[in-house]
């Protein structure tokens, strides 16, 4: 299958300084983030056209990740008018998956095997008086929330015997939490999402 749904230029060999100049960094209320992305050689994912014509089955499958050499049992098209594709997902070099560069969670997990010091657990947040719906920064300035184990209930992240997924917030600096998260496994896989687990980027 051709990777027609990946409309990115390969940037793995581009100097980091040059890559950063093309990165969209906006801190604050506007939480849009577009990291410099290449094409994954390890993972592919299901891509669905989201409009009024989309069916439940296609919408549910959107974003599911498969190994590049994996055979998909129920591959698209699922029906006569299906417009879904399975193609190579985007990859991002560690240090570009968040707005914080080498201080970001993607860099720290990739090269240190843990979150940065500024991540705080829910238990610690509540101990500081945090109430749901309130701005986290009011209770933990300059910190982000570590969510603990991510259940992967929809099975969109790759599964394997003994694999456990974890999650943490990224990229918010004021106001409410945004839709950006990082997820990583106990066996070395790292992905980021900027739309609350609908689609992912591989961190390499």
Task: Walk through the language-model features, giving the residues of each.
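Domain-core detector
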Residues: 1-81, 87-104, 122, 127, ...
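Functional cores of ribonucleases/endoribonucleases
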Residues: 41-49, 54-60, 128-204
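Second-shell loop/turn segments in exported
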Residues: 108-114, 187
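Conserved hydrophobic ligand-interaction patch in extracellular adhesion modules
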Residues: 117
């Amino acid at each position: 299958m051709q990777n027609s749904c990946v409309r990115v230029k390969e940037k793995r060999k581009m100097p980091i300084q040059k890559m950063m100049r093309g990165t969209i960094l906006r801190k604050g209320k506007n939480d849009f983030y577009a990291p410099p992305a290449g094409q994954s050689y390890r993972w592919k994912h299901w891509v669905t056209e989201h409009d009024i014509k989309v069916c439940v089955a296609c919408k549910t499958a959107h974003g599911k990740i498969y190994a590049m050499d994996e055979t998909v049992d129920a591959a698209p098209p699922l029906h006569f008018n299906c417009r879904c594709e399975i193609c190579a997902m985007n990859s991002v070099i560690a240090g570009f998956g968040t707005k914080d560069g080498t201080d970001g969670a993607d860099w720290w997990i990739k090269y240190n095997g843990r979150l940065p010091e500024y991540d705080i657990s829910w238990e610690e947040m509540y101990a500081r008086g945090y109430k749901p719906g309130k701005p986290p920064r009011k209770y933990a300035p300059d910190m982000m929330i570590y969510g603990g184990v991510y259940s992967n209930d929809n099975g969109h992240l790759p599964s394997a015997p003994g694999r456990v997924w974890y999650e943490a917030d990224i990229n918010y600096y004021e106001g409410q939490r945004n839709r950006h998260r990082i997820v990583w496994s106990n066996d070395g896989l790292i992905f980021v999402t900027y739309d609350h687990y609908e689609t992912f980027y591989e961190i390499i």
